[in-house]
C-alpha cells in the first residue's frame, strides 16, 4: 500500500514534505538546531512551537520509481537553500544516525551521493512513524525514531524503539 500525505495524495519519490507530528500540541515539524558544541545546526529536532512547520525534507530512494511504499529504504535530506549560511555551500544534507548517541544528524555532502537510505516510513495507528534500519538489514532490526528532550530543551529526533513519534507529511510546495 502506498504512503499518503496529509491531503490523501501519494508520497512522491523526490518530493519535498514537511514532517509534522500527527498529534497536535506536541511541538512542530522537524527542523535543525545547534546542540552541544556545534557551531552550525546539525541536529534534527522537532520545533518547539506547534505553529512552526520546520524545514521541508526531500524524501527519496535511488530506484527510479514514482511512488513510495512502506517497504522502501529511504533517504531524508534538507535543502541547503533553506538553511543558515554555514550550510549553504553543501549540495545536499542527508540524515544519518550517530552511532554512539543514536541521534539523527545531517551529514553535509559536497556532491550528490546515491546511497541506499537507512530509513523507512511505516504505518503507525492512523498515521506513520519513521524507523531507522542499521546497515539496511531486515525489518526486525529497524527501530523507531522518537523524541528525546535534552538539557537545553531541544526535542531531538533519536532512535527510541517502542516510543515512536507519530508523523504526517505535508507537501512543501502546494499547487493552487
Curated annotation (Swiss-Prot):
Bridged cysteine pairs (disulfide): 40-86, 133-142
InterPro entries documented for this protein: Kunitz_inhibitor_STI-like_sf (IPR011065), Prot_inh_Kunz-lg (IPR002160)
SMART domains, per database record: STI
UniProt keyword Disulfide bond present: yes
Keywords associated with the record: Disulfide bond, Protease inhibitor, Serine protease inhibitor
Single GO molecular function: serine-type endopeptidase inhibitor activity
Coiled-coil stretches noted in the UniProt entry, renumbered to this chain: none
Domain of life where this protein originates: Eukaryota
Protein purpose: Inhibits trypsin and alpha-chymotrypsin stoichiometrically at the molar ratio of 1:1 and 2:1 respectively.
Family of this protein: Belongs to the protease inhibitor I3 (leguminous Kunitz-type inhibitor) family.
Protein name listed in UniProt: Trypsin inhibitor
Protein source organism: Acacia confusa
Gene: ACTI
Amino acid at each position: 500500500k502506498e504512503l499518503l500525505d496529509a491531503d490523501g495524495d501519494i508520497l512522491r519519490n523526490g518530493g519535498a514534505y514537511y514532517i509534522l507530528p500527527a498529534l497536535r500540541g506536541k511541538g512542530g515539524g522537524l527542523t535543525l538546531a545547534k546542540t552541544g558544541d556545534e557551531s552550525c545546526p546539525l541536529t534534527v529536532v522537532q520545533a518547539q512551537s506547534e505553529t512552526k512547520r520546520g524545514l521541508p525534507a526531500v524524501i527519496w530512494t535511488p530506484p527510479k520509481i514514482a511512488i513510495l511504499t512502506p517497504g522502501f529504504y529511504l533517504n531524508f535530506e534538507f535543502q541547503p537553500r533553506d538553511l543558515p549560511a554555514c550550510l549553504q555551500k553543501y549540495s545536499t544534507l542527508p540524515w544519518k544516525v550517530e552511532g554512539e548517541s543514536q541521534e539523527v544528524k545531517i551529514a553535509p555532502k559536497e556532491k550528490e551521493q546515491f546511497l541506499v537510505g537507512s530509513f523507512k516510513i511505516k504505518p503507525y495507528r492512523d498515521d506513520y512513524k519513521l524507523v531507522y534500519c542499521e546497515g539496511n538489514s531486515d525489518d526486525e532490526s529497524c527501530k523507531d525514531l522518537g523524541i528525546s528532550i535534552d538539557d537545553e530543551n531541544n526535542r531531538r529526533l533519536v532512535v527510541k524503539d517502542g516510543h515512536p513519534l507519530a508523523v504526517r507529511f505535508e507537501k512543501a510546495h502546494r499547487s493552487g
